[in-house]
C-alpha cells in the first residue's frame, strides 16, 4: 500500500494553493469546505476564485510562483497550474522544505492524493 489513508482536520491549518484556473477552483472549494486557511499564488485568477476569496478571507498573491513563497508554516502545498514544468518545480521545492505536496493529476510526484468524493443528497 503506497498511500496511508487518514483524515485531517484543516481548521486553521495553513495551506498554499498555487494556480488560479479551473483546477485550482475545484481544490479551493474542497479546502473551503474543510475550513482551511488558504493562500493562493497565481499571476492571474478566475473571477470565481476572486469572488470566493473575497467571501472567505483568502489571501491571493498575484505573482508568479518562486521557491521564496514556500514556508514551513504551510501544512501542505497544492500545485494546480497548467504548467507541467512549474508543477514539477513546486514539488521539488516542497520536498526540499519537508512540506507535503500534491501535484494535481500527477500522483507519481505527490506525497498525498485527494480521493474521489461522492456527494449525495439527504437520505
Question: Language-model segments: which ranges?
Answer:
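Short alpha-helices
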Residues: 116-123
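Hydrophobic, well-ordered beta-alpha structural blocks that scaffold small-molecule cofactor pockets
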Residues: 1-53
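Conserved SAM/SAH-binding loop
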Residues: 63-67
Amino acid at each position: 500500500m503506497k498511500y496511508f489513508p487518514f483524515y485531517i482536520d484543516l481548521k486553521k491549518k495553513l495551506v498554499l494553493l498555487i494556480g488560479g484556473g479551473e483546477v485550482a477552483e475545484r481544490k479551493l472549494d474542497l479546502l473551503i469546505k474543510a475550513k482551511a486557511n488558504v493562500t493562493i499564488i497565481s499571476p492571474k485568477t478566475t473571477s470565481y476564485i476572486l469572488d470566493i476569496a473575497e467571501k472567505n478571507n483568502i489571501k491571493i498573491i498575484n505573482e508568479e510562483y518562486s521557491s521564496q513563497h514556500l514556508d514551513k508554516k504551510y501544512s501542505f502545498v497544492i500545485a494546480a497550474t497548467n504548467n507541467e514544468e512549474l508543477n514539477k518545480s513546486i514539488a521539488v521545492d516542497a520536498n526540499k522544505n519537508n512540506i507535503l505536496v500534491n501535484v494535481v493529476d500527477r500522483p507519481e510526484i505527490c506525497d498525498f492524493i485527494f480521493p474521489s468524493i461522492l456527494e449525495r443528497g439527504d437520505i
